[in-house]
Regions:
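A short beta-loop-alpha structural element at the N-terminal edge
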Residues: 14-26
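C-terminal "cap" of GNAT-fold acetyltransferases
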Residues: 162-205
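Acetyl-CoA-dependent GNAT
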Residues: 45-91, 95-101, 113, 118, ...
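Conserved GNAT acetyl-CoA-binding A-motif
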Residues: 119-144
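Conserved acetyl-CoA-binding loop-helix of GNAT-fold acetyltransferases
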Residues: 104-120, 143-147
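A short, internal acetyl-CoA/4′-phosphopantetheine-binding micro-motif in the GNAT/acyltransferase core
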Residues: 95-103, 131-136
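Conserved GNAT-fold acetyl-CoA-binding loop/helix
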Residues: 27, 31-54
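Conserved catalytic-core motifs of GNAT/GCN5-like acyltransferases
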Residues: 78-81, 130-132, 146, 150-169, ...
Length: 205
């Protein structure tokens, strides 16, 4: 059952494709994750120019979706290559970041549902999430991200132990995956996000 607060958010929130000019505002969402958490293993906040380049590079092939309400960007999600080799083409890695104070309201689910639908339109068959994972929850990292992905249907598939060092402690990393379709011989070619019919994309926003 959808709570009143979540219902109100879903009624007022709008999704759209990110634009390079969103870089500065999106970076304000991302920066606290770098500076205050181990959710991302980056040490330094990227520059606006670097973040803009990341958006532009992603949009060459993959979706980069932002959630907006009243002109304010509340979060974003995107996919990218799982690996660069051609045989991995039907798998994509997911990322999602929600603005501080906006978690627990259904925003993450809304963004991921759009990403999943678009990925199906692209003929992507696997969504893979690389998730920072603590042995024990601490002030920098909890197991919430893994639990969020599990609620969306992602399955745990593997773990790397003590592979990342941040804030003076070691963290694990887990992989979770969501299968989007049957893995047939001679699968349909993957369609770049920029080549999808924009009208079809807008319908799911």
């Amino acid at each position: 059952m959808i709570g009143k607060e979540e219902k109100n958010m879903n009624e007022t929130i709008k999704l759209r494709t990110a634009r390079p000019d969103d870089a500065e505002e999106l970076l304000k969402i991302y920066a606290p994750y770098v500076e205050n958490t181990a959710i991302t293993f980056e040490y330094e906040v990227p520059s606006v120019a670097e973040f803009r380049a990341r958006i532009e590079n992603t949009l060459k092939k993959y979706p980069y979706i932002v959630a907006e309400r009243g002109g304010e960007l509340l979060g974003y999600a995107y996919t990218g290559p799982f690996k660069s080799r051609a045989a991995y083409n039907w798998a994509a890695e997911t990322s999602i970041y929600v603005k501080e104070g906006q978690k627990g309201l259904g925003l993450g689910r809304k963004l991921y549902e759009a990403i999943e639908t678009i990925s199906r339109m692209q003929n992507i068959l696997n969504l893979n999430a690389c998730i920072a994972y603590p042995k024990v929850d601490d002030e920098y990292l909890t197991k919430n991200s893994a639990q969020f992905h599990e609620h969306l249907g992602f399955k745990y598939v593997g773990e790397f132990h003590d592979c990342a060092y941040k804030f003076g402690r070691w963290y694990d990393m887990i992989w979770m995956e969501l299968s989007l379709g049957e893995h047939m011989a001679d699968p349909a070619a993957v369609v770049a996000f920029c080549d999808l019919d924009k009208r079809d994309v807008e319908k799911i926003m």
